[in-house]
Amino acid sequence: NGNLIQIIENPQSDILGENYVFSPLKVAVDYADRIYVIAQNQFEGIMAFDAEGNFTGFTGTINVQITTAEIIWRKLSTKAQRAKQQLFIPTEFTGMEIDSDGFVYATNVDAEGEQSVRRLNPSGEDVIQKGAAGVSGDILWRLTGDYSGASRIIDVVVREKGIYSVIDSTRGRIFTYDHEGNLLYIFGGIGSQEGTFDTPTAIDTIGDEIIVLDGSKNLVDKYRATNYGFLINQAVGLRYDGDEASAVECWKQVLKLDSNFELAYVGIGKSYLAAGENKKAMECFKTGNNRQYYSIAYKRYRNEILKENLTGYLTAALVLIILLVLWNKIGKKKWKERRASHV
């Protein structure tokens, strides 16, 4: 009932250093009461504490990748030039949430727009599925002008059936993905009209509704799914539970509202693939622009055709062999008869 159990402050560890100042920004707790903290100016990763509040180390450190060109340039540049160059230090996390399996979904700012969301297993390894276009918000953006640059993903909320949503503070948009990293839908934006944000700072859910905190407007916006969004969520959830047949019916309803929604065709195609209807699956994957599953369906369909016609091919080959044997025997017999007539 809101009783204070424990206060965690100033964790002590050799890896933190003597003068470390603990400035927690965000906190999350998993099913085993392990505590995860994003702390200010903490680049080593997310701080982890056990159920008793003891600091146990870091998880999910983001290693900065240095390209070969950057390494060569740093070797060739002068000391003054190197001093002006950006330091290659790990990136801070900006938001996190823990799913029902104990995996930590964490967001970070990535200027390149390549990976702004991670799903960390208990070992701290990123096991997130990125889909065809990644899970970092916008895949195309302007380099100059207002709202330029990659999406700045600052927070994440985990929803039901493997669905999760992230919020971009650059353009104020919310991106929702399924557990495979497929983009489901986008909404929101920067503006003054209803349904837009000034400075979105956090995202969460209450039941089936999404709530977003706006730091400048000092208010909380609440969103409820439209029929279109509801059908997509339902289709993804049914497939997540293994109910492919029911998911197909939902995808068909989605296509009535948006005939260009590629993921719906892919969802229907996967159902056909599971049912062994490979030709129909190929058609759906082609329309859904999914080369990976199209190749799988094509190989299965090719094997299916070969198997169906194998008996015919073997029969034709057997008949041909018999004819060749008979022809050979008849030819030998005639040759012997001619030879005997000449003697």
Residue positions per predicted region:
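Eukaryotic scaffold repeat domains enriched in small/polar residues
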Residues: 1-278, 285-289, 295-343
